[in-house]
Amino acid sequence: MPYVPLEWLRQYVQVRPGTDAAALAADLVKVGLEEEQIVPARVTGPLVVGKVLTQEPKEQSNGKVINYCRVDVGEQHNDAPGTGKEPSELPSRGIICGAHNFKPGDSVVVSLPGAVLPGDFKIAARKTYGHISDGMICSAAELGFPDDGKHGIIVLDERYPEGEVPAPGTDALALLGLDDEVVEINVTPDRGYCFSMRGVAREYSHSTGGAYQDPADTTNADFYPQGLQAPGNDGPRVEVNDEAPINGVPGCDRYVARLVEGVNPNAPTPDWMSRRLQASGMRSISLAVDVTNYVMLELGQPLHAFDADKLTLPLVVRRAQAGEKLTTLDDVERVLDPQDLVIADGEGGSRVLAIAGVMGGATSEVSETTTNVLIEAAHFHPVSVARSARRHKLPTESSKRFERGVDYQLAPVAAQRAADLLVRYGGGSYGPITEIDRTQAPAPIEFALDAASRLTGVDYPREQVVGLLREIGCQVNDDGGATVQVSAPSWRPDLTGSAELVEEIARLDGYDNIPVQLPVAPAGTGLTFAQRARRDIVRTVAEQGLTQVLSYPFVGDIYDRLELPADDERRQAVRIANPLADDAPLLRTSVLDSLIDVAVRNVSRGIGDVALYEVGNVTTSAGVVPAPIPGVAQRPSQAEIEALAAGTPRQRLHLGAILCGQHGYSGVLQHVRNWDWADAVELVRDIASLLGLKLHVANAERAPWHPGRCAEIRIVVPTKNPTRPQIGEVIGYAGELHPRIVKKLGLPERACAVELDLDALIECSSKQPVVKAQPVSTYPAAKEDFAFVVDEATPSQEVAAAIIIAGGKLLDDVRLFDVYRGPQLGPGRKSLAFSVRLRASDHTLSASETEAARARIIKQVGKYTGAKLRA
């Protein structure tokens, strides 16, 4: 992300006094430029100007000659005469130096003990070559500057006119620009213009109101001493021929080629430019390359420098041909794609020189012998550059800017700026210019003046709206109507509609000015009945000692392992078009499909006592006919929407549970038993009781349960005749899993499972009449015991139901307390013993009433179940 040196920023915008890096970051945040980090100064500690007083060459045993110097570092840093680590008659410090490009009387840069130089090089007084060096005389490289070719220390007398050299003790950090902190900012994709000092300075001006000076203003003689020179007919030949534009948009609509001749290849990059490049995260390479990088950082226009003597004109901008190759500046040979936009030379563009907007090639790069430089400044289409950069995995500073959008009017200005710098610092001369301009200004935006107020809730006066739009560079044609015509500035390709203009108005006025008002929820009744019921169910199951889990609803071919019949509707699972895992491409039709795998995983890891439950959706496609998917060209009709809804697989909320191993924990005072089928059924009864429902439980055969220990769960639906309730549809199963399946899965013996349709349970519960509390009878109860002999296949529930019907209002309670099988009953017969309690609400039952009720019970049970009273 871009680095913003405060010293550089001051050149283009008036910065408030006392502003440091933290304050700069805070000001930029106000206009939407977030702070990534604050980069501290490269050098810390005392770095001062020193004047060499004496220089004593001392030859060492290894033949090396070093200099022992006494250096005046200012009154506040000097050792007084006769004091210090090595006393001297001169107020100074003793310093050892191995360089020889200075003499007594020269002013140099001295780092004193306590300073930290780049590379975490800490300066301290140390004994070396027989003397104590109480500091260090610094070279450019030691301070992090590029090599100036002299390989020696910095002599300030060579940089300042006579009489203007700073006095000893002067702070050299500020003198050399080493104390400047840098702010790294985060730029969103729509704000590509902020990848330049020009853009950041403009945003800082918006934030603080500081006076802004556009570095792209060619009428400013300080930046452009020659103004903007016009192209002529004698410029380099250029052809732009994009025969395969992406999405119909040409890859290049503006191309400027500009020659600068006679550049001194040994001319150094000026210190101020090197410092700014380094502060911005770039290394100094050569004057020509540094100038192109500097102008890119300053204006936001990527440039490329070709060695003009290595080119064969014309330059051709075209699409690459299949199989073409290019060795880029990073020494990687790249195979080009026909969608790559390239710069080539020669007739017909026979030789590829660069990938447009991404990186140049090695064959035409600027070298240490280059004297004639051709500067390329172009406007490339963002999509074309972005695809090439991603295709070749080659993100560059250039591509980052082009793919976010570059000012389409900036190419000739940036080329002029680069030429001026090369002429000034490289001793070159202005050469001819060629420009191809096919750019088109975007159409004006019709903008409603009240749009910003409507969307933000802030009352923006007409004058403020127009003023803010003009402040960001828009041309506003205001004829006094409700709307205005707005033309976005060339550096803002992101301003394409009314919404973007509203965002700019809110941003410049300040997001803090938008009132923060949380919406107030309308008064209601809180949770719905279904929501409360689901919460109560989850709590009730957890209170029974079960642990809730959440598993993925995606399963594989588990149905054979669970031994489901071939025609079982649970096999009609929905197949996912793009599954997360190839071995789980189906949506579960039962919670047990995925919950069993969770239990198996726990058991395989040594957890033998498992009591898990899950509440989740199951999906079934049984009876669903998929509808054709309508196109996107127009809104689907109501009939198509209804067909899609009808063709969508149904989802129901189910509860599943797995119970195996010990029920609870064993201890000295506690005997622990294993979970069994009765626990599974009782869990279902607890849920039904919570919802105020009565259940009809009957034996059933359903995989994967044990055929003799599987309970089919139905809801008893009340009718107008309370003694004749209706038995509803099946809403679940509970019981022991089939021993063969348990063994196959590796679960403990007699593992149990539950599966309930919670949606059906909750729906039935919501329809139940409100239960009215009945007063507790204070009259005594009459107790009667019955032992009925029935067929082995007759469930006890049917006998109990007949007792309830016969007992009517007098029935207070009925319980099964014994089941007996014996030879005296005969084969296929069993005895069910019930304890019945009878009670009237308003009187004590007489013997005759009790006897009559007993007779009715015996008759009713015999009628509906064929039972005989056991003798």
Model-derived regions, located:
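Glycine/proline-enriched, intrinsically flexible loops and inter-domain linkers
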Residues: 3-8, 12, 24-26, 55, ...
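Beta-rich nucleic-acid/ligand-interaction surfaces
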Residues: 43-46, 295-297, 487, 522-528, ...
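Phosphate-backbone binding interfaces of nucleic-acid-interacting proteins
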Residues: 1-234, 349, 374, 391-393, ...
